[in-house]
Design a protein with these regions (language model features):
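Short loop/turn segments immediately following the C-termini of beta-strands
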Residues: 55, 112, 168, 269, ...
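Residue-level detector of Asp-centered blade-edge/turn motifs that repeat once per structural unit
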Residues: 43-47, 101-104, 157-160, 258-261, ...
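Gly/Pro-rich loop segments of beta-rich domains
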Residues: 2-37, 68-95, 126-151, 181-252, ...
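Structural signal for beta-propeller blades
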Residues: 58-61, 115-117, 171-173, 272-274, ...
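Conserved beta-propeller blade signature
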Residues: 49-51, 106-108, 162-164, 263-265, ...
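Short loop/turn segments that connect beta-strands within beta-propeller blades
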Residues: 64-68, 121-125, 177-181, 278-282, ...
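Blade-level signature of beta-propeller repeat domains, shared across WD40, Kelch, NHL, RCC1
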Residues: 388-417
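Conserved beta-strand position repeated across blades of beta-propeller domains
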Residues: 34, 39-42, 97-100, 153-156, ...
Length: 417
């Protein structure tokens, strides 16, 4: 068995990918295959196959967990939309980013560039569009195939096969109910004024805050002080905890997860936070991050810890939340009981120091063992290894965390304690 698991708790290995940015190796060992820009991932219900969106080739590929071989599943390797009502392996995908399984083992694909959510029937392999017209720009709620999506980036299922969609460039979270075939909005508002506020402000009269809270305050045209990040971006529109989620500004939501209570968590890369939408009350709150980007350590409440452009989140069966802290090159864990944040993978380095080698290219220093062998970090503790720009996360029933390492074109596997 190629992928027989022998990792000790806390250690990391390469599960798939040779680090090269060209899609290769169908039918061969996954660790020898090229998997350009793996994004989000999921395991099927039987945990026979591991599926991932290979955004660099516009395909969905899968790894057989027992044999360790990789195979194409959906997409033809061309950036296009085509093939509805046909076999998924002959359909065109346009920047697929998200994948998720419903209770019947049907695979749903977030076909971002075509502004659609597509479904592959488990029994027949036929692909269809279930949400989206193909047009972008918010046009309200209603029947699923009459509703526009705008570059959706992630999907996740709740109970009763209700699908939650990160409608990224519409700055909204959408809810698709397959029983009624209706799409509704559960979070997010955005206006033309909000677009203007994404630009750095110019200081006229300013007051420097004491300490290192958010940054500095700029006076707007009405004389109000606005909390601003150190890079000049207006953060005032994000200070909406405790308010209805429908009134919240969601800047760049690129990840989504659902907990055991059916509450929805969105990863807002643009505000460097993970937000929680309480489905009973409709109220939004922050569970990790402080708006400002950076890294200021672990072992503190997650709501006081800095994140840097996080892109994904997932829950384990004990209710702990794992976050891809992408530009901090770490995977973080938020304890479900205490709310404290720690790192489970990644030492914070983006991946080694590049050196010129006399006009012949560049060499990468990885890591050196006492025996003089170079390593990427496999076989090390997860917190000692380099994890370069982690994005999508998946979890199996044995407590293994799968990490799509976009910066290295690999998928890593970590044995959780």
């Amino acid at each position: 068995m190629e992928t027989e698991l022998c990792l000790a708790a806390g250690y990391i290995e390469t599960f798939a990918g040779n680090g090269k940015a060209r899609s290769t190796g169908d039918g061969k060992r996954a660790v020898k295959a090229g998997i350009p820009l793996p994004h989000h991932a999921a395991l099927d219900r039987e945990e026979q196959w591991f599926y991932f969106a290979e955004s660099g080739s516009d395909r969905i590929r899968r790894v057989h967990l027992q044999e360790g071989t990789v195979h194409n599943f959906a997409g033809i390797g061309e950036t296009c939309y085509s093939g509805d009502d046909g076999v998924c392996g002959e359909a065109g995908l346009y920047l697929p980013l998200g994948v998720a399984f419903d209770s019947r083992n049907n695979l749903y694909i977030c076909d971002s560039g075509s502004n659609r959510i597509r479904k592959v029937d488990h029994e027949t392999g036929i692909i269809t569009t279930v949400v989206g017209t193909g047009q972008h720009g918010f046009n309200g709620d209603g029947p699923a195939r009459e509703v526009n999506l705008t570059w959706p980036a992630a999907i996740a299922f709740g109970t009763d096969d209700v699908l939650y969609i990160a409608d990224t460039q519409a700055h909204k979270v959408r809810r698709y109910d397959p029983k009624t075939d209706l799409v509704t909005t559960i979070a997010g508002t955005w206006t033309a004024e909000d677009d203007a506020r994404e630009q750095p402000l110019v200081a006229r009269n300013l007051v420097v805050l004491s300490g290192d809270a958010i940054g500095i305050d700029f006076s707007d045209d009405q004389g109000w002080l606005m909390p601003v990040c150190s890079d000049g971006l207006d953060m005032s529109m994000y200070l909406d905890d405790g308010k209805p989620a429908m009134d919240a500004r969601l800047y760049d939501i690129v990840g989504i997860a659902v907990d055991s209570k059916d509450d929805v968590y969105v990863v807002d890369k643009g505000s460097n936070r993970v937000r929680k939408i309480d489905v009973q009350t409709g109220v939004i709150s922050t569970v990790a991050g402080v708006c400002r980007y950076g890294y200021d350590g672990d072992d503190k409440p997650a709501v006081r810890a800095m994140l840097h452009a996080p892109e994904a989140a997932i829950f384990d069966r004990d209710g702990h939340l794992y976050i891809s802290d992408t530009m901090n090159h770490r995977v973080r864990k938020v304890d479900g009981k205490t709310g404290m944040i720690t790192t489970v993978a990644g030492n914070g380095d983006s991946g080694y120091e590049d050196k010129n080698i006399g006009g012949c290219g560049a060499a990468r220093f990885v890591a050196k063992e006492s025996a003089g062998q170079l390593k990427h970090g496999d076989g090390l503790l997860g917190i000692e290894a380099v994890v370069n720009s982690p994005v999508g996360l998946a979890m199996d029933s044995q407590g293994h965390l799968y990490i799509c390492e976009r910066g290295e074109n690999k998928i890593r596997r970590l044995k959780l304690s």
